[in-house]
């Protein structure tokens, strides 16, 4: 097992910031003024070979393959102040605060509103089965939207979801999980403040999300992400509106192509063509 309990030195490495902890190294990129990347390298392998990203600020083994649809940008400007108890990385619109004992990362917008906070002792860990886990602070008024193709209510607050695509023909539209297509991306919207923030976990391994279903009074209310393999590789996308998050998420992963007119309206799939008696 590996658990990030304490943090060490934070270094400016040019295009990213390196964060030392007792367990693993973390790296933080200001991809844009509104998108952060936080990656915990449990295996110590920082190889880049993504087929998902259409905007990057680093070299990848898939750059040649993706050259017609990928844009390379310069990391956004930010300034590091490192101290004994905490480090602060100040960007144009986002501020990252790294508390060192206990270790956690917090992200604020330019108005000082808290967008994200890790849960100390739970945030970056590897269990005895080598699954990697990330836990984030949530509030009672938070709603969660996204996750790809899912059954049940649109708001996934207090839900547990498995992300393991398979053939789910004949599924229960209220309860079955999981379905065909999963996307480890969601938007957290607070009903009180109306502020939203996006979470995209850049990983294709099977995983699960616990959106506040689990409650332990040792810690603040939290959600968690657990993946069977790969790094915790989080892209945190600032809003504050859902519309702005969707725009920035699709900058990161690609825009949808406009469908032809014939494809709009009510779709009839091949599954139903054999069912009508007439």
Where are these regions (language model features)?
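N-terminal accessory segment at the very beginning of proteins
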Residues: 1-266
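Conserved small/polar residues in nucleotide/adenosyl-binding loops
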Residues: 271-277
């Amino acid at each position: 097992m590996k658990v990030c309990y304490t943090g060490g030195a934070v270094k400016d490495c040019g295009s990213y910031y390196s964060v030392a902890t007792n367990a693993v190294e973390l790296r933080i990129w200001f991809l844009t003024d509104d998108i952060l990347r936080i990656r915990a390298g449990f295996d110590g392998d920082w190889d880049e070979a993504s087929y998902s990203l259409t905007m990057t600020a680093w070299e990848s083994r898939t750059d040649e393959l993706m050259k017609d649809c990928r844009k390379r940008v310069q990391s956004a400007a930010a300034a590091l102040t490192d101290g004994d108890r905490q480090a602060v990385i100040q960007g144009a619109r986002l501020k990252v605060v790294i508390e060192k004992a206990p270790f956690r990362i917090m992200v604020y917008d330019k108005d000082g509103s808290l967008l994200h906070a890790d849960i100390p002792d739970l945030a970056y860990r590897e269990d005895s089965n080598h699954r990697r886990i990330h836990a984030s602070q949530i509030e009672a008024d938070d709603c969660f939207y996204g996750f790809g193709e899912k059954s049940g209510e649109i708001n996934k607050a207090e839900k547990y979801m498995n992300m393991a695509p398979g053939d789910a023909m004949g599924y229960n539209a209220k309860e079955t999980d999981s379905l065909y297509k999963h996307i480890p991306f969601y938007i957290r919207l607070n009903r009180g403040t109306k502020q939203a923030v996006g979470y995209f976990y850049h990983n294709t391994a099977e995983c699960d999300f616990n959106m506040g279903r689990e409650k332990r009074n040792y810690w603040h209310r939290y959600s968690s992400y657990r993946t069977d393999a790969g790094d915790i590789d989080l892209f945190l996308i600032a809003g504050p509106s859902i519309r702005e998050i969707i725009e920035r998420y699709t900058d990161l992963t690609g825009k949808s192509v406009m469908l032809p007119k014939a494809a709009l309206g009510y779709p009839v799939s091949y599954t139903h063509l054999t069912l009508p008696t007439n």
